[in-house]
């Protein structure tokens, strides 16, 4: 099934009713109610007239009235408010960046991993005390929120990085052991996950399999792409090492996903990547495709972002292969099954700690020298106090980074799904009111339309 650029801006109605059009005609879509219906043009005209002014029902024909009443019975005209739940900054999850050192030199790395962010900042690693106090904070919050009746079942420690976190393997072990001790002491389960480039030793693999609940591997899908884009520091290819890691994880039955960064040179082979992954790493949790974003080391390399229309078409072709092979394929901006008001947790106090002890709301903003840190950094670890200090004014400002405040998204049918996209990308150096989207919007709209079309085409099977 091909996707067509939806016409969704001209006809919207007050109760979040959008009219999309594809090659088969109009589609009525109410995202907050997850309601979808194909309709002809007279039905669309009647529905929009009623949505804007219910008194028009009196002057409608019998057929128009029947359409409006049927749609109304199914909830298309119901005014729905997005349920916003504000609990203050009481995180039960933390993402720790153990180090900015890295054993790879990926040609498009947003953080210049292994090179201090590209701004001359030194290679460093997190103090164990910083990690311990972060775990204390989220574990106490989890215990308190569980006692208060909140739907909290555990605390989560994610290992990530502006480098390869397992370059600080001894620190990671101490972090995990400490978290397990705290979990036992407070009676709150601890969950550990990690993002890694997959270049791990046997000892590290044994530890991951024994102690982590899930892992996400950055892997570019085919041996030649992996070796070219993600070489080991010094220039050797990394495919053999990462392939071994993923086969070990498969053998252990461990949940893991693959994140593939797609460049213009790779885009036409996306379906082949899906087939290769399905054949060689059976049972992976998901395969995640993202077009490269031209920042960091990518700016000085030959890698460029694929054209949005080409990425979209190859993604749809890949989706067919994925369905045939039993692979879950995802793109971050296309998630019609989710109703959200923020793309990520940046506006709800995402608690991420950099190697220097700074607290950022965004994985992509991890250095003080990054101009975006003025917006996204909202705290730090104070060694004299032995605890974290947070800037409430910064937290308040971050809480405004949601789709309710993005006028550009008002008339977009994806507004409650992609929710304005990644703030670090689309708000780079500009104010929220200047948000004007990006080429990623074209991809998100086309792929979300495709998800809507698939729901319309779905039929229950016998049995």
Q: Model-found features: residue ranges?
A:
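N-terminal [4Fe-4S]-dependent radical SAM core
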Residues: 3-38, 60-95, 148-151
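Accessory C-terminal segments flanking Radical SAM cores
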Residues: 12-45, 330-442
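Short acidic, hydrophobic short linear motifs in intrinsically disordered regions
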Residues: 46, 50-60
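Canonical Radical SAM [4Fe-4S] cluster-binding loop centered on the CxxxCxxC motif
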Residues: 88-89, 93-130
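Conserved, mostly hydrophobic/aromatic
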Residues: 102, 106, 217, 357
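Radical SAM/AdoMet-radical enzyme domain recognition
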Residues: 131-162, 168-292
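Short Fe-S-cluster ligation motifs
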Residues: 133-160, 435-463
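Radical SAM enzyme [4Fe-4S]-AdoMet core and its adjacent flexible, acidic
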Residues: 228-243, 247-347, 352, 356-359, ...
């Amino acid at each position: 099934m091909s996707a067509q650029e939806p016409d969704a801006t001209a006809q919207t109605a007050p109760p979040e009713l959008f009219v999309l059009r594809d090659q088969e005609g109009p589609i009525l879509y109410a995202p907050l109610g997850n309601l979808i219906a194909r309709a002809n043009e007279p039905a669309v005209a009647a529905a929009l007239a009623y949505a804007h002014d219910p008194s028009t029902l009196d002057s409608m024909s019998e057929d128009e009235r029947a359409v409006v009443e049927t749609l109304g019975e199914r909830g298309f005209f119901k005014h729905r408010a997005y349920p916003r739940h504000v609990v203050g900054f009481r995180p039960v999850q933390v993402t720790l960046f153990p180090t900015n050192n890295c054993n790879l030199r990926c040609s498009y790395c947003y953080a210049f991993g292994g090179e201090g962010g590209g701004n001359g900042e030194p290679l460093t690693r997190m103090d164990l005390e910083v990690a311990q106090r972060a775990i204390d904070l989220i574990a106490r919050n989890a215990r308190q929120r569980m006692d208060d009746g909140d739907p909290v079942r555990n605390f989560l420690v994610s290992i990530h990085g502006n480098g390869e976190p397992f370059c600080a393997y001894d620190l990671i072990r101490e972090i995990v052991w400490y978290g397990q001790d705290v979990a036992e002491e407070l009676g709150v389960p601890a969950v550990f996950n990690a993002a890694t480039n997959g270049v791990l030793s046997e000892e590290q693999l044994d530890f991951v399999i024994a102690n982590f609940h899930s892992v996400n591997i950055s892997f570019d899908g085919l041996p030649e792409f992996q070796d070219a884009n993600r070489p080991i520091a010094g220039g050797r290819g990394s495919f053999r090492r990462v392939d071994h890691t993923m086969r070990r994880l498969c053998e252990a039955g461990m949940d893991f996903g693959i994140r593939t960064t797609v460049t213009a040179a790779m885009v036409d082979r996306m379906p082949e990547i899906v087939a290769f992954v399905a054949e060689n790493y059976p049972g992976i949790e998901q395969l995640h495709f993202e077009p490269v974003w031209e920042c960091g080391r990518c700016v000085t390399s030959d890698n460029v972002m694929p054209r949005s229309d080409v990425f979209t078409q190859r993604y749809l072709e890949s989706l067919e292969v994925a369905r045939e092979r039993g692979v879950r394929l995802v793109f971050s901006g296309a998630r019609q099954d989710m109703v959200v008001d923020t793309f990520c947790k940046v506006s709800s106090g995402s608690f991420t700690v950099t190697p220097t002890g700074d607290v950022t709301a965004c994985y992509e903003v991890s250095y003080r020298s990054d101009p975006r840190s003025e917006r996204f950094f909202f705290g730090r670890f104070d060694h004299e106090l032995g605890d974290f200090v947070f800037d409430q004014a910064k937290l308040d400002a971050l809480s405004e980074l949601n789709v309710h405040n993005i006028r550009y998204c008002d008339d977009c049918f994806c507004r409650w799904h992609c929710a304005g996209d990644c703030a670090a990308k689309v708000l780079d150096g500009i104010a929220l009111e200047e948000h004007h989207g990006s080429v990623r919007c074209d991809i998100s709209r086309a792929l979300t339309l495709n998800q809507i079309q698939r729901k319309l085409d779905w039929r229950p099977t016998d049995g």
